[in-house]
Each structure stands twice: as structure tokens, then as C-alpha cells.
A protein has these predicted regions:
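Alpha-helical membrane-inserting segments
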Residues: 43, 47, 129, 133, ...
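Hydrophobic alpha-helical transmembrane segments
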Residues: 31-35, 97, 116-121, 185-192, ...
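Membrane-interface loops
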Residues: 66, 97-99, 104-186
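Transmembrane helix-loop junctions in multipass membrane proteins, especially transporters and channels
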Residues: 53-57, 111-112, 138-143, 207, ...
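Membrane-embedded catalytic cores of phosphoryl/pyrophosphoryl-handling enzymes
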Residues: 146-257, 264-266
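Alpha-helical transmembrane spans of integral membrane proteins, capturing the lipid-embedded, hydrophobic core
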Residues: 37-42, 89, 119, 123-127, ...
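Actinobacteria-biased recognition of intrinsically disordered, low-complexity terminal regions
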Residues: 1-34, 230, 234-268
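N-terminal transmembrane-helix/juxtamembrane module of multi-pass inner/ER membrane proteins
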Residues: 1-95, 137, 141-148
Length: 268
């Protein structure tokens, strides 16, 4: 009985003293960076809203772009159908999240637990943070005559744009090591076209302002950057070399055992 009561105390002492090993530090960094991103991004979103509402050049850009693209949509109904397919099916947030979920399952089967955790936390944190900022800012969507599409909820930031940013970044950084070097530029182009294309469809369909889309991109990049820094810190803890975006997040994913078991240091 005495041993049972002393074990939790020892565990608590280890947590307080910080001697928890690289895996525990990795989890702590993930939570810390996600919280820091939320604290930084919400004031940024509010500041951006103030700029949008008070700075005439940005307001003119929002309204003129919306009016021109809406006029083009009314003149080309076939193009509207293409845009709706892209935004509601191919690039829908549900589609993006399912792709990330499939990636997480595959990574777990490969034994890449930390990379799977990074992917899941990045996607989840991005979605929750975007929803939080939407409700904090509570910006109305564009109101255009004869709308060609409608969308529920608030406008800033664009959830489609943010989900595309986080999802494409997760898929790209996780899978890039498996792509032949000569095809990696094509993978980057495909990801960029997807992210930009998602933003275009939302503005062209009249359900978002340009600044909404820009806000979604920026917030998504902030989340990816924060969680990626946490992952890189874990790699440094276990003695792995620092990677670059061109290499992908974990080049070892190509090997049979991409990560050491939890609690076991990496072999030199």
C-alpha cells in the first residue's frame, strides 16, 4: 500500500522538477504553443478587424473585389457551378479533415506516434481557434444583390481558407519525404494552388471578403508554425537533425521504424 501511495508522489515530483524526458516535453510544448497561438491570434484578429473597418483602402478593396467577382458570377452560371463543386466538395473543410484523419491513422500504423500527434493537434487547434475568433469578432458576411451562394455563421476569418492552410501544410510536411525530389516542387505548387483556390472560391461566391480569406490564411500559418516549432524541439531533444520545409517534418518516415518507442531515446 505504501508503494502505491508513493508512486503518484514520485510522478508529481518528476513533473514539477521538469525531469519528464523528451516525450513529455514534446506534449507540454504542443499545449503551450497552441495556447500561445490562441493568445496571440485573437488580439491580431481583433486588430485586423479594426483595420478593415476603419482603414478606407482595405474597405474599398473588400467591396470592389466582391462587387466585381459577384458581377462575373451572375454572368457565368456555369462557372458558379464549378466554384460550388470546388468549395462544397473537393475543397470542403470536411474533405480536408478526412484527409488529415486518414493521414493520422496511417502514421499511427507506421509507428510515427509524435508525427501523428502533431498532425492531429495542428488540425484540431486550427479548427477550434478559427471558431473562437469568428465568435469573438462576429463579423457579418457580405450582403450582395441576387446572391449566388449563402453560408452560415460569421465571416472573419474564413474557415475554409484556414482549414485549407492547416490541412495542406500538415499533408505536405508529413508526406513530403515520401515524394521523389524531382516531384516535390509540384507538391508545393499543388498545395499552394489549393490554398489560394479555396480563398478565391469563397470571395467569388460572395460569402467572404478578401480580408476574411487573408485572416484565415494568416491564422492557419500561425498554428502550423507554432506546432511545428514544438515538433522540431522534440527532434532536438532526442538528438535528431533539424529539418527544413523542403525536407518535410520527419524524413525518417521513409524507414521501417521512423520514431523510437515512447519513453525510449533515439539511437544515435
Amino acid at each position: 500500500m505504501a508503494r502505491l501511495t508513493t508512486r503518484p508522489r514520485r510522478l508529481l515530483a518528476r513533473l514539477v522538477s521538469g525531469r519528464t524526458g523528451p516525450d513529455a516535453r514534446f506534449g507540454a510544448r504542443l499545449l503551450t504553443t497552441v495556447a500561445a497561438t490562441a493568445l496571440v491570434s485573437v488580439p491580431f484578429a481583433l486588430a485586423l478587424l479594426l483595420v478593415e473597418s476603419q482603414w478606407p483602402p482595405l474597405a474599398r478593396l473588400d467591396h470592389r473585389t466582391a462587387e466585381r467577382l459577384h458581377a462575373a458570377a451572375l454572368e457565368h452560371p456555369a462557372w458558379v457551378r464549378v466554384l460550388r463543386f470546388l468549395t462544397d466538395v473537393a475543397w470542403d473543410p470536411v474533405t480536408m479533415r478526412l484527409l488529415v484523419a486518414a493521414l493520422v491513422v496511417w502514421l499511427l500504423l507506421r509507428g510515427a506516434l509524435r508525427l501523428a500527434l502533431w498532425a492531429a493537434v495542428t488540425a484540431t487547434a486550427g479548427g477550434l481557434l478559427g471558431l473562437l475568433v469568428k465568435h469573438v469578432v462576429a463579423r457579418a458576411r457580405p450582403h450582395l444583390p441576387d446572391p449566388v451562394a449563402e453560408a452560415p455563421g460569421f465571416s472573419f476569418p474564413s474557415g475554409h481558407a484556414m482549414t485549407a492552410t492547416t490541412s495542406c501544410a500538415v499533408l505536405l510536411l508529413a508526406l513530403l519525404p515520401l515524394v521523389p525530389r524531382r516531384l516535390r516542387p509540384l507538391a508545393w505548387v499543388l498545395a499552394a494552388v489549393t490554398v489560394v483556390g479555396v480563398g478565391y472560391t469563397r470571395v467569388a461566391l460572395g460569402v467572404h471578403w478578401v480580408s476574411d480569406v487573408a485572416g484565415g490564411w494568416l491564422l492557419g500559418l500561425a498554428v502550423v508554425t507554432a506546432t511545428t516549432l514544438a515538433f522540431e524541439a522534440w527532434r532536438a531533444d532526442v538528438g535528431r537533425l533539424r529539418t527544413t520545409p523542403a525536407q518535410g517534418l520527419e524524413p525518417e518516415i521513409r524507414s521501417e521504424h521512423p520514431e523510437p518507442p515512447v519513453g525510449v531515446p533515439d539511437r544515435p
